[in-house]
């Protein structure tokens, strides 16, 4: 066996040949992944090698190599029975590997999906999509792919070498991913951001979609309907302050503008705020001035308050008013600092859980061509975080 806790060597084949010549029954190679494609190089080595080979990439970037080891022909993988006794960086506890990822059911024909993000450790997309696939009897597995911003192009250019069928896209890739697509779904060109990739089974052509727009508006409508007697389905909002100017902010701003809402953008990068404001015929305020004017609704479309930095908020509590609607797109945790403080003031609150489940359900339809088990998806998210509920 061979271990390298710093990198994945360039000449994996040469290393394997050296170990195989030692008259080994099984060759094991474990290296640290510094690039997402290190997983691919390792798995391709496993698939083409004799004698039987176990090739694993360590670290968070290396997660796919551990889950897909069997699909590529590895003799076995490693998983600690006790999650408190992780012996190597990136090891996945046995229960998670077997129950969430269904490792024993993965075969060469299993379709692979995942989420590309940086960071990705907080994402509960694997929990939700794997539960949905299991409930629907779909032969698929959904993985977290840690893809730093500078590596997006390399990963997508090599996507044909993976058994990938589709990807969710989140921070920081929602805007950049559009430029790599062969085709686009509705609204993507107008918004300039996508959160979903589908790969054609035969041509491997990449089509991008945006399921955030309808999910965001529907989440607000559903939450307000539950909190307002006689709510007729229209938002009833006149002015909305959106915090952030990234992919999620773009989708929400576009969806709200379609509802006739006046949108104001505030982010730490004025240029990005101006670009988004022009897209939706909205206004811009500097980040430092976001508290100065009253709004019917405040939307947090930044990662502020996301796990593990749960004690941060993008909007100071002293500026919240009881008549406001507060929508936080962060779903992990569901009850962010912003949500708690808005609830204390008496605001109507929309948590990120409803938007998350709705956009994931639309992704499920795109990938699998059937209605999603939304109840299962909500329950999986509920078990992973806190109770899914409308806060009154």
Where are these regions (language model features)?
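Catalytic alpha/beta core domains of metabolic enzymes, predominantly
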Residues: 1-109
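Glycine-rich adenosine-cofactor-binding loop
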Residues: 57, 112-120, 210-213, 220, ...
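Phosphate/diphosphate ligand-binding glycine-rich loop within oxidoreductases
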Residues: 110-226
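Conserved beta-strand positions in the Rossmann-like core of class I SAM-dependent methyltransferases
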Residues: 143, 264, 350
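Conserved S-adenosyl-L-methionine
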Residues: 258-262, 345-348
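NAD(P)-binding Rossmann-fold cofactor-contacting core
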Residues: 259-280
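Rossmann-like adenosine-cofactor binding region
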Residues: 278-349
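Rossmann-fold NAD(P)-binding glycine/threonine-rich loop
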Residues: 324-374, 379-380
